[in-house]
Amino acid sequence: MTKRESNTLAVLGCGMVFLVSLLDLANRLLGALGTAILSGILASMADQTADDSGRLFTNFTACVRRKETGAAVSDKISSHANANKVEILNKENLRGVKQADAVLLACQTHLYKALFDEPGMREALKKKLIISVLAGVTTAQLEAALGNGEDYFVIRAMPNIACFVRDSATVIEKPQRTFPEALLHVTDTVFKAVGNVFYIQPSAYDICTALCGSSPAFLAVFIDSMVDGAVAMGLSHKDAVDMAACTMRGAASLVLESGNPWTIRHQVASPGGSTMQGLLALEQGNVRSTISNALMVAAKEAKKLGSKENA
């Protein structure tokens, strides 16, 4: 990406999609991911000065397929001070790519080939950074769909919906061929603006898609279950949600500090205490194996998303 006074990031896929099935999570959230990343970057710009060297992008283009989606995206980002830096284009992907210095590919998985097939699109994408957050679609698949992979700079990343609050756990796949350091820096900076970044080998990508991309939904189910229990015993729903969410956030901070979830478990569960009785109830319900299995199923499903494209 050339350094100039104005740099533009185009986000291809900003649909506001809601969950229907946990197994469909990785694909169904892609449009929402594009909006989440854009929202998080806009929020991060509020912490930067006008001459901040870390500010890689000054303008943004959000590409959508429906007017109502564009209106929803506009509403979602309206609270940001830099919302006026975002241009929303309806059914104008090519225009968005042409005026961009880098592209975030965040459409639903089954749409990427049709997007590349748009007249002039492959030429417009040449030599530009293409950051893909498509679950299950490998770099090799993307390069093959583009044509000559050597003409494109494609890198995979999997953030999660917490980009909205700049607390995502994002995994970035280490490029397997020579990749410009400047473009790696751009990718790193984009995702550090919305949370934490981890670099992984391609072999671990589908696992991390489930662990980082899907698990916020699993954790939300866990919180919701705790809320149900508290409400059943008389606590108000709002208080229960706030307390359960804050408790999970605090527990996560403790795990990050200690590096071992078992440390927290043993610190809280005293012999003969109420916490130990609650833990035994969880074990009787096979919660540990159920959660582990959910993660493995999600990882397998994420891999299938890419496999279906080659069927």
From Swiss-Prot:
One GO BP on record is:
L-proline biosynthetic process
Q: In which pathway does it act?
A: Secondary metabolite biosynthesis
Please provide, alphabetically and separated by semicolons, the GO molecular function terms listed in this UniProt record.
pyrroline-5-carboxylate reductase activity
Gene3D superfamilies in the record = NAD(P)-binding Rossmann-like Domain, ProC C-terminal domain-like
- Glycosylated residues (UniProt): N59
Q: What is its EC number?
A: 1.5.1.-
Signal peptide span per the entry? 1-31
The top EC class, named as a word, is oxidoreductase
> Null-mutant phenotype, please?
Abolishes completely the production of KK-1.
Q: What induces it?
A: Expression is positively regulated by the KK-1 cluster-specific transcription factor kk1F.
Pfam families, per database record: F420_oxidored, P5CR_dimer
At the top level, the lineage of the source is Eukaryota
What function is annotated for this protein? Delta-1-pyrroline-5-carboxylate reductase; part of the gene cluster that mediates the biosynthesis of KK-1, a novel cyclic depsipeptide with 10 residues which is a promising active compound with high activity against many plant pathogens, especially Botrytis cinerea. Within the pathway, kk1I catalyzes the synthesis of the L-pipecolic acid residue of KK-1 from delta-1-pyrroline-5-carboxylate (P5C), a metabolic intermediate of lysine.
Concerning its family, UniProt says:
Belongs to the pyrroline-5-carboxylate reductase family.
Name of the molecule in the record:
Delta-1-pyrroline-5-carboxylate reductase kk1I
